[in-house]
């Protein structure tokens, strides 16, 4: 049986056990897509990434992104986390205050700038495609039920709830207050309802 190393990183935080966790397999060559999906299911995190040699000119690495349920063409949190992980492992030569690295993803080759301070990556700035705007959700009752809030928490902002994509479509909306945003959490989410809303909108809960 082959052995593959992985590391787990917390993205969007500077504190241990904070942010959004991600599993990264930095040397995934030899794994099939089915095996990657099985490993992502076993990790049971929002996403797991698998790093491969690039197949496209101009790319430094090929990265495949999986949720426990499916492969994604693109997602921000795993891309940022994988850039940091590869730099941390010494896989990216850090030259000067900014080092650019290009990932081959399901949506194409996208660059990111690694901002370096005292030899360490302090920030990852990712470039995405221009946004495209799609369907507006007219009735947000089911969406509100899925996130554990009242429909009014969404509708009283006066802002539309719309599917927007910079590579992977997502439902974008706003809430009345920061307190309502901070109150969101896994304990209040109804994933069955959210999956149904996302499928109807042509997107994914991740």
Regions from the PLM with identified roles:
Residues 1-74, 80-206:
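Active-site proximal loop and beta-alpha junction motif in alpha/beta enzyme cores
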């Amino acid at each position: 049986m082959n052995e593959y190393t992985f590391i787990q990183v917390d993205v969007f935080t500077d504190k241990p056990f904070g942010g959004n966790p991600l599993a990264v397999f930095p040397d995934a060559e030899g794994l099939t897509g089915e095996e990657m999906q099985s490993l992502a299911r076993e990790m049971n995190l929002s996403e797991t990434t698998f790093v491969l040699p690039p197949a496209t000119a101009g790319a430094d690495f090929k990265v495949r992104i999986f949720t426990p349920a499916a492969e994604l063409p693109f997602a921000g949190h795993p891309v940022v986390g994988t850039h940091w992980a590869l730099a941390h492992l010494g896989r990216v030569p850090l030259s000067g205050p900014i080092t650019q690295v290009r990932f081959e993803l399901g949506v194409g080759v996208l660059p990111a700038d690694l901002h370096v301070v005292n030899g360490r990556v302090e920030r990852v700035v990712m470039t995405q495609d221009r946004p495209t705007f799609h369907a507006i959700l007219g009735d947000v009752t089911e969406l509100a039920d899925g996130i554990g809030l009242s429909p009014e928490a969404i509708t009283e902002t006066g802002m539309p709830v719309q599917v927007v994509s910079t590579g992977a479509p997502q439902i974008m909306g706003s809430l009345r207050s920061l307190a309502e945003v901070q109150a969101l959490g896994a304990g209040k989410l109804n994933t069955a309802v959210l999956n149904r809303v996302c499928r109807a909108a042509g997107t994914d809960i991740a």
